[in-house]
Regions:
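Membrane-interface "cap" regions at the ends of multi-pass membrane proteins
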Residues: 1-41, 217, 249, 253-256, ...
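Flexible loop linkers connecting adjacent transmembrane helices
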Residues: 4-10, 44-48, 70-96, 121-136, ...
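Juxtamembrane transmembrane-helix boundary signature
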Residues: 31, 58-89, 100-114
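Extracellular loop-to-transmembrane helix junctions
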Residues: 46-71, 94-97, 303
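Hydrophobic transmembrane alpha-helices that form the core helical bundles
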Residues: 97-139, 151, 358-375, 483
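Loop-to-transmembrane helix boundary motifs in multi-pass membrane proteins
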Residues: 139-153, 342, 375-423
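C-terminal membrane-solvent junction of multi-pass transporters and transport-like membrane proteins
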Residues: 167, 173-176, 386-390, 396-410, ...
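Hydrophobic alpha-helical segments and their helix-loop junctions in multi-pass secondary transporters
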Residues: 179-207, 215-234, 447-461, 484
Length: 484
């Protein structure tokens, strides 16, 4: 046993100072940025512009009652070293995995069309309205909409970056772009904040006529879609830190049972942390604390931004329908009317940061989930797992059913399908609202499954990872509210 303990004694303990933790942030900030470019930059201004402060209550409802649905995914991955989809594969006939696969393929097309529409709308406004360059006039001459051209260009760039840099590119871009957006938006809000009396609308439920689509979009995509918790679980696993780093060694040394998606039960996912060497326990606990702080910080920042965008739109744009291809120019009035024309550049930088990073992250996230589903459904894919560059062999690249190739194929499918939809429906706000509302109907199932597997896989004696009584009860309450 001492030799086993010695094999874990060299694990580097991560810093837990604020500066040290921030260097390790990633999945939580990525999760936050998957919603900002649409729910914050488009849906929130549409709510404020059309209904003033009436829908402010939707924001705390979404953030408070969806919190543990996301948190359970982080908790499970940190407690077991496996992803939520590995847990889903232990259900009868793997029905949750099939459910996720089908809904994710739909989201790859319709959902990504909404994300690309928002990003394309920024470029359309900059080049066609603000600068008047008309770069896509050639496309209109042959019957192709300008938004589809910009969407294809942005999508192709995103796919190229993700395939070249893998997870590191996603993580680094997210940190930089999130900082640009947060600073510029808060700065503009401080120039002329909303009246204090409007804050009472946080606690007053009101459903104005014609607001149902925006409400569904808010609840579906604030802070982001619940299905993104599965992406975050895969991202967390991809970092290969904490339990995700040592799980394989634990299986080799007999601390935990090996997990096989085609023969194991959910009991084989469980890790009794109390039986691990003390250094390994501390290593896993620290990474869990960092992961929770990463997620919670992203959740709070996302809440602040969503609130500010709605309040700014209510103050500066109401009454306005907030629609059309030039929607970004209309939203830009928040910045130019409040501070001056010079703020246009700041807004464009923030808007592009939000919308592009959202589309960028989804080009990695949804294909990652589809590939993980196939890894848990098909033996040929499970025999060639992994998409990280250091995991790839010639077989990974040559065998079409490998997880890596399914990941790449899904990425290209998402790009083509999203651009086709965008070309057929060149209405950015409408596409954003519909794709966001779709996430609302998926959320309860994913939230339930995340909670169920945390409660039934993580040992109750594990005080560090097992959900507290409050977290459990509040999670059930949240499910009742979102399904009631």
């Amino acid at each position: 046993m001492s030799n086993k303990s010695d094999s874990f004694s060299t694990l580097p303990l991560p810093e837990t100072s604020p500066r040290g933790m921030f260097r390790h942030f990633g999945p939580g900030l990525v999760l936050m940025m998957t919603g900002i470019g649409t729910s914050h930059l488009v849906t929130a201004p549409a709510a404020g512009g059309r209904f003033e402060f009436a829908l402010l209550w939707c924001i705390p409802v979404a953030y408070v009652f969806k919190y543990y649905g996301f948190e359970m995914a982080f908790r499970f991955t940190n407690a077991t070293g496996r992803s939520m989809l590995d847990a889903y594969s232990t259900a009868p006939r793997k029905w949750p995995v099939w459910y996720v696969l089908i809904t994710t393929l739909i989201q790859c097309a319709l959902g990504q069309a909404g994300r690309l529409a928002a990003a394309a709308a920024v470029l359309f406004y900059v080049f066609s309205e603000y600068l008047g360059l008309g770069l896509t006039n050639w496309a209109q001459g042959i019957g192709i909409d300008s938004l589809a051209v910009y969407g294809f260009g942005l999508g192709a760039i995103s796919v190229a970056i993700v395939l070249y840099g893998r997870y590191a590119a996603v993580e680094m871009a997210t940190k930089v772009l999130a900082g640009i957006l947060f600073v510029s938006t808060v700065g503009v809000y401080l120039v002329e904040p909303a009246p204090f009396s409007a804050m009472g609308r946080f606690f007053t439920v009101e459903v104005p006529g014609g607001s149902w689509l925006i409400i569904a979009a808010f609840l579906g995509l604030l802070p982001t879609g619940m299905d993104v918790s599965l992406q975050a679980s895969e991202w967390g696993k991809a970092k290969r830190v904490g339990m995700g780093r040592i799980r394989e060694k634990l299986e080799e040394q007999g601390y935990v049972r090996p997990f096989d998606a085609f023969s194991s039960t959910k009991a084989d996912l469980s890790v009794d942390v109390t039986k691990l060497p003390e250094h390994a326990q501390e290593y896993c606990r620290r990474w869990f604390r960092i992961g929770l702080m990463d997620f919670t910080l992203g959740h709070i920042v996302s809440f602040i931004l969503a609130t500010i965008f709605l309040l700014l739109a209510a103050v500066w744009l109401y009454p306005s329908p907030i629609e059309g291809r030039a929607v970004i120019g209309e939203i830009a009035r928040i910045f130019t009317d409040s501070v001056g024309p010079g703020m246009m550049v700041v807004f464009i930088a923030g808007a592009f940061a939000a919308t592009f990073s959202t589309a960028f992250n989804y080009f990695d996230g949804w294909p990652r989930v589809v590939a993980a589903c196939c890894r848990n459904l098909f033996r040929s894919t499970a025999d060639l797992p992994g998409i990280a560059a250091d995991q790839l062999t010639p077989a990974h690249r040559s065998v079409m059913s490998s997880e890596y190739n399914i990941y790449r194929i899904t990425m290209f499918y998402s790009l083509v399908a999203a651009v086709v939809i965008l070309a057929g429906i060149p209405r950015p706000v409408y596409l954003v609202l519909v794709s966001s509302a779709l996430a609302f109907f998926i959320a309860p199932v994913i939230s339930f499954l995340n909670l169920y597997y945390c409660l039934t896989v993580i040992p109750k004696t594990d005080k560090a990872f097992y959900p507290s009584r409050f977290a459990t009860l509040f999670s059930w309450l949240s499910l009742v509210i979102f399904t009631g």
